Amino acid sequence: MALTLTDVKRIAHLARLELADADAEHTLVQLNDFFGLVEQMQAVDTSGIAPLAHPIEQIEDVALRLRNDVVTETVEREAFQRPAPAVQDGLYLVPKVIE
């Protein structure tokens, strides 16, 4: 799939972007290079290859990198609220700023 300069200008118009002719030509080259790369990737036969959730698992055991979900800290609400000027029922009281 190759774009034309008209395509780039139309996309810029739809996106409400003002694009100078030199910028449009530069963008055209970049987009066509990108689409060329996508076509190369699509040409590779990947049938029979399982998708990878974590590509690093091909190198090392992913389970070692993921830890168990355990509580490591305790809630110290009272200690945090001790220096506060006003607290009620575990909530910080602040002055009203909007009438």
Swiss-Prot record:
Its EC number is 6.3.5.-. One of its GO terms (biological process) is regulation of translational fidelity. It comes from Paraburkholderia phytofirmans (strain DSM 17436 / LMG 22146 / PsJN) (Burkholderia phytofirmans). The keyword Glycoprotein does not apply. Allows the formation of correctly charged Asn-tRNA(Asn) or Gln-tRNA(Gln) through the transamidation of misacylated Asp-tRNA(Asn) or Glu-tRNA(Gln) in organisms which lack either or both of asparaginyl-tRNA or glutaminyl-tRNA synthetases. The reaction takes place in the presence of glutamine and ATP through an activated phospho-Asp-tRNA(Asn) or phospho-Glu-tRNA(Gln). The keyword DNA-binding does not apply. Pfam families: GatC. This is Aspartyl/glutamyl-tRNA(Asn/Gln) amidotransferase subunit C. It catalyses: L-glutamyl-tRNA(Gln) + L-glutamine + ATP + H2O = L-glutaminyl-tRNA(Gln) + L-glutamate + ADP + phosphate + H(+); L-aspartyl-tRNA(Asn) + L-glutamine + ATP + H2O = L-asparaginyl-tRNA(Asn) + L-glutamate + ADP + phosphate + 2 H(+). Heterotrimer of A, B and C subunits. Keywords: ATP-binding, Ligase, Nucleotide-binding, Protein biosynthesis. GO terms for molecular function: asparaginyl-tRNA synthase (glutamine-hydrolyzing) activity; ATP binding; glutaminyl-tRNA synthase (glutamine-hydrolyzing) activity. It is an enzyme of class 6 (ligase). Belongs to the GatC family.
